């Protein structure tokens, strides 16, 4: 797996100019754990936030979870689903997307962009380029629909980006 990570990071660096950092820690977890990381469920529970019941219910159907993988920029950890297969090209594309975030944060790129969606847009664009270069067909459950992708990648005036407030960078899939 480490060799795959290095190859993908070198590809990203070659297309962005980002320096190649140490590889991130990779943890394989359940889809529910990925969802909990994405929504900050542990923190919501500590704060007795009413959104905990909405986003963090334990009995949710794992197939209804749209988030496939997550990068936590504070810990430098990429969380992949337990079913991740390093030989599957579509799964490699998801890993590449998360590695883009790793390189972005290690290069402090997050400090110069005007909003979080710019990071996401670059990650999706690089993933698309890699998919095209490698002639990969992405299954529907690992893709993001056009409306969700637009929402994730377009900056809005009401959406200032404050780097210290946001440490989990998702890779979403549209399971519907």
Stretch-by-stretch model annotation:
Residues 1-62:
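A metal-dependent hydrolase signature that marks the N-terminal structural subdomain at the beginning
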Residues 2-3, 85-94, 113-121:
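Soluble non-cytosolic domains of exported or imported proteins
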Residues 42-89, 102:
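Active-site scaffold of zinc-dependent metalloenzymes
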Residues 48-52, 56, 64-65, 123, ...:
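Extracellular/mature segments of secreted proteins
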Residues 80-82, 104-113, 133:
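Substrate-binding clefts and substrate-entry loops adjacent to catalytic sites
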Residues 93-106:
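Active-site recognition of the HExxH zinc-binding catalytic motif
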Residues 114-147:
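Post-HExxH zinc-binding segment in Zn-dependent metallohydrolases
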Residues 134-176:
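Long, well-structured alpha-helical subdomains associated
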């Amino acid at each position: 797996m480490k060799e795959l990570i290095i190859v993908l990071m070198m590809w990203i660096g070659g297309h962005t100019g980002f320096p190649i950092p140490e590889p991130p820690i990779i943890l394989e977890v359940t889809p529910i754990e990925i969802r909990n990381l994405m929504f900050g469920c542990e923190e919501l529970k500590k704060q007795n936030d009413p959104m905990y019941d909405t986003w963090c219910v334990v009995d949710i159907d794992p197939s209804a979870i749209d988030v496939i993988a997550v990068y936590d920029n504070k810990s430098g950890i990429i969380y992949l689903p337990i079913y991740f297969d390093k030989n599957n090209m579509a799964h490699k594309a998801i890993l590449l997307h998360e590695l883009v975030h790793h390189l972005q944060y290690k290069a402090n790129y997050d400090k110069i962009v005007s909003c979080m969606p710019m990071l996401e847009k670059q990650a999706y664009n690089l993933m698309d380029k890699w998919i095209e270069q490698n002639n990969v067909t992405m299954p529907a459950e690992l893709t993001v629909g056009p409306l969700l992708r637009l929402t994730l990648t377009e900056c809005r005036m009401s959406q200032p980006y404050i780097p210290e407030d946001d440490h989990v960078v998702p890779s979403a899939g549209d399971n519907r």
